[in-house]
Amino acid sequence: MYNTEDIKQLLIEKYKNQDFRVTKSGVKTVELQNVQFIADKDYILREPNYDYIKREIEWYESQSLNVYDIPGETPAIWKACADVNGDINSNYGWMIWSKENGSQYNNCIWHLVNDPATRNAVMIYTRPSMHVDATSNHKHDFCCTHYVHCFLNPTDDGYSLKYIVYQRSQDSIFGYNNDINWHLYVYKMMVKELSEKLKCPIKTELIECNVGSLHVYERHFKFLE
């Protein structure tokens, strides 16, 4: 399986070959489709902004569906995704913890505790109505994450936790950095909770990513040069 350095080199190669995908608005992108890799680093092309990541996770923890509740300055990208009132769909904390979205985190834990060999331990982020919800009230927010699939694999004294992320779309400059740090946060939480409930050690693994469209926008091509 590829790692983040492999992904970086694949993106650079496409850029050098001028293998572009052009959006409806005429913006060039470099895009990898249906790509699978190990998240051995928390960035691909540009180091993360940990101050912002901390604030975004705090907002996810709040489960607020309004971008103006993000601590500090609300990033322009979130303002662009939101409707006229600042409301969005993609608060990932709301998507995995809220009862309104099916208590995804709790259900995932329940499956793993009740049957460590289960294939049903998923956290479903998006929903069928996203086709309509994405643009309701002038939003531009079609959730980028489909779901997370977790497995417990036996070790000598307990289990290891495999955590696989399935993405519809991911920007390689900011999106991957922010998303993988969110998933690392949730992963550590799961390891602790599973260890307590199963009363055995839970070993960690590197997160695995499956992305339908992993891309770099034209305004960020300098990171490929």
Where are these regions (language model features)?
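Terminal, non-catalytic protein-protein interaction segments that mediate quaternary/complex assembly
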Residues: M1-E225
